[in-house]
């Protein structure tokens, strides 16, 4: 009897144990990452040929204690390697694990290699050559603490390499994991199986091989026992011949069918090639089809299984499309596949909840480093009275109501950018802004007392409902998370896409960027203030301080300002402002852009302006500014400097976003200035619920 070890992906150990026992293995013992078992020589070959779940089959050769590199060398050399290798066999060493002595796996592999080679030269035998790419024998050494375990890898290449894969699509799953997913899906061979996001077809191919009794090792060309001196070629040929016979019989007798589709024509072509190479191409129908086009290919079949490994996102900007995808799949299952089963394998359990289905079973497994879950669902048969469940129904109803109200208003106003929803319902704490045919959803970060999983699920529901109510394509929705801003964080760069969208605001054309920054380049709540500036600017010299992307300057220029001066500390935003001005034909010497610390520039400037707009930050301690700035504390000093630049009869429009801001009217009077609050006049319909989003003042000479 041979003592053997079969490795597998985390979470599949018990499934592998059952498989090995069915092959005839005895004394099976599950450990993390695999199964120890015993069997005769025939079982060695059967496990290699027939295991769908094992990553590798190892033949343990011994263990040794490693307190020094010499211990490792002597421990390896103690094994009778000359009786292990066929003459002329090449070999390679795979070494994993470190300890205080062996701190580099390459060094460990070198010591093992030296010990094996020296075992031959000491007996005056030809030394075996190393072949890292295609060795006849693979030696595996695993070092854990002070113990090194040495084994022959009888698999050669990993057993997931069945020999049928042409080229993988994006983010494939290994064939061994795919087989486990099929086994756990609840699908019964002989019934229909469909994968609507099949990629290169791995799940369907593994299922078809299982259903037709086709051994997973049948198409492999190389094995790790080819240079093993104890290899029994006669038994191996018997095992191989039996597998070939069973495969022919299984294919001839199988009558059901498999269906796969994917939106990518290139991966569908690969899937067809893979299925043909696997010998089961005639059983699988592959189509280029988006999930939105999914229909039941066998509507008269009482039951079948939909099985898939849908995409998941690691980046925030991919989530809206994925949420929409899962929501859509859930609706299609209910409408088209009543009575069928659904099984999905995913690294994102939150996305699976968007199906709006209740799972009957779930399994955990690893896909490489990713923690994944497989959930099985039974889809109830629909009845004429069945009504689809609405996701986030209260939110959807409010958004629908707001859409009806604001869409017509915005069209009449001549604006393309407006707020559709502003945390109207406390439990749905987001802002939804429309930018032409795009939508930005800003999640206000939930307090730490709220369960993170529940908050994420609520956000997913919001996104699904937003896409549904507004009827937009998922890739037209941008998701952002907004936390309380500190200093310059409001200008934090989020991405590098550099994609700008042209929008209109009254008679102005403006560039917005929906993805690269937390803000888009256009503060929607200041829309009316910008229009007022345009109406006030004819024939005047206009100054815009803390100008951001210069949208107020554009309105002033279009309103007939004699000159405009735009000042901001950020080169990025000044370049953006220049693009906005150019887009509206506002170029030349009359339109200056100045990169400077606005407060420092203000103290030193000696020019005169008729109309000044200033929208400073609530607080700033930027390293590029000379002093920290607090708008409540410092606004009077700001007005003192502004007065010096204000031409007789001129006006300052002063705005800020500090909640509870109190204008120092007495202090202003001492400066010879007076203030008129116009906050309510600058709040449009879409910000009527948020009266404190900003405050705005007109300041003139007393």
Swiss-Prot record:
Major enzyme class: transferase
Enzyme Commission no: 2.1.1.173, 2.1.1.264
InterPro entries: 23SrRNA_methyltr_KL, DNA_methylase_N6_adenine_CS, RlmKL-like_Mtase, RlmKL-like_Mtase_CS, RlmL_1st, SAM-dep_methyl-trfase, SAM-dependent_MTases_sf, THUMP_dom
GO cellular component, one term: cytoplasm
Family label: Belongs to the methyltransferase superfamily. RlmKL family.
Protein name, UniProt field: Ribosomal RNA large subunit methyltransferase K/L
Organism: Escherichia coli O157:H7
Catalytic activity field: guanosine(2445) in 23S rRNA + S-adenosyl-L-methionine = N(2)-methylguanosine(2445) in 23S rRNA + S-adenosyl-L-homocysteine + H(+); guanosine(2069) in 23S rRNA + S-adenosyl-L-methionine = N(2)-methylguanosine(2069) in 23S rRNA + S-adenosyl-L-homocysteine + H(+)
Coiled coil: none
Cited CDD domains: AdoMet_MTases, THUMP_AdoMetMT
Primary site of residence: cytoplasm
Keywords: Cytoplasm, Methyltransferase, RNA-binding, rRNA processing, S-adenosyl-L-methionine, Transferase
